Amino acid sequence: MAGGAMKRYAIVIEEAGANLAAYVPDLPGCVATGESADEVERLIREAIELHLEGLVEDGLPIPEPSSRVEYIEVNAET
């Protein structure tokens, strides 16, 4: 995808035992795990690039990023 149009995909990073896991809501099946935030972010970036390259090789469309990330504040007192 070098030289192609840049797209900005939302990622979700969750704790997974002793590691972190990341996935891309707009790219089902595109996941990565790592031992640190830096590692999992690097690995999910690589996974996204490989996923998109595979779609292009298979003649499939590249999904447009459509997921939004918002945080909602709630009263958590019990």
Explain the meaning of each model-derived region:
Residues 10-12, 21:
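Beta-strand secondary-structure signal
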Residues 1-10, 42-78:
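Short, charged, surface-exposed hinge/linker loops at domain edges
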Residues 14-16:
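Short beta-strand micro-motifs enriched in acidic
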